[in-house]
Amino acid sequence: MDEFIGTVTGLEEINPYCFFVRVNSSYSSTVALDQVVRVDYYWGDREFHAYGMITEVKAKWDGSISTGYQEEAYNEGIYQGVPIYLGKVVVTRVLEKKGETLIPVPYSFPPPAGEKVFGACGEELGVALGFSEIRRGKRALPCGILPSGDVAYLDLKYILGDNGA
């Protein structure tokens, strides 16, 4: 089952490479750095699945006062703002759905504000980070454990110099 984390927010700039998720209030205690997420969205009649990793978590006020004294006003009961958490997501992969097939595409269209964001785990985590491709090509070298408990892999082509230094 997909784990709902939050919503793509327009409180910060959204572009094809980076967006912010406004963390669901019931989920904020467990959102974590390096967590892999997925957002599904349409651009015209095209369907996309964007994957990314949370690289930063920040708290801010959701309200109209911006004097810098919200904390005192909130503690005195004067300010009715709501503290919110935003997770910065750096996009790792975008796939376009064509029929029943998902095809990697360049990052061209950002997810629109308001789209739901879900946690990625298991097989989906492998797709998000490219592990499924290197495992399929029999060039995956296990190298560690991700915060989710899943195995991380290195691509042997890079280690052996076929695709890298």
Put a short name on every predicted segment.
Residues 1-164:
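Basic- and hydrophobic-enriched, low-structure N-terminal and domain-boundary segments
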